Amino acid sequence: LDYLKELEIDYLWITPVFISPMNDNGYDVADYYKINPQFGTMEDMDELIRECDNRGIGLMLDMVFNHTSTEHEWFRRALAGEKKYQDYYIFRDEPEDQIPTNWQSKFGGPAWEYVPSLKKWYLHLYDVTQADLNWENPEVRGELKKVIRFWKNKGIKGFRFDVINVISKPELFE
């Protein structure tokens, strides 16, 4: 950090360090409130924030709010049939043999995955393990605001929002 200060660096941007199955290098977040052990502990993060602050360097986190990992508690609860959490994501009731749209995932193949136990499809614009959040749901926006407040209260000075340009989805899927 001293070397960065000597270079007059005033912000340090780090990619996702949260709990993740790492199917997409951490961009598949399973818990926004915990540090992936591959990168250290929450105490390590607190120390990094403090040491950056001591040098006048702001720490900026990369936040992934278009989707979560399918291992996230919200998605697991959605799969368990909890309607509240199904509304956190974009599910469609089309028959198993009828994909809701012809949209393609950025990772290849259809952007929809069928869940036989629910008889529903969920949207994943990226990897099949990255279920898109439903930004039309005010509870989702509220949960994500809590995440931001949590990290701001820890001393994070800025955020980069990954693929924020795709959070808005049309009401009518064609």
Where are the predicted features?
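Acidic/aromatic-lined carbohydrate-recognition and catalytic surfaces
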Residues: 1-145, 149, 153, 164-174
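Receiver (REC) domain switch/active-site residues of two-component response regulators
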Residues: 157
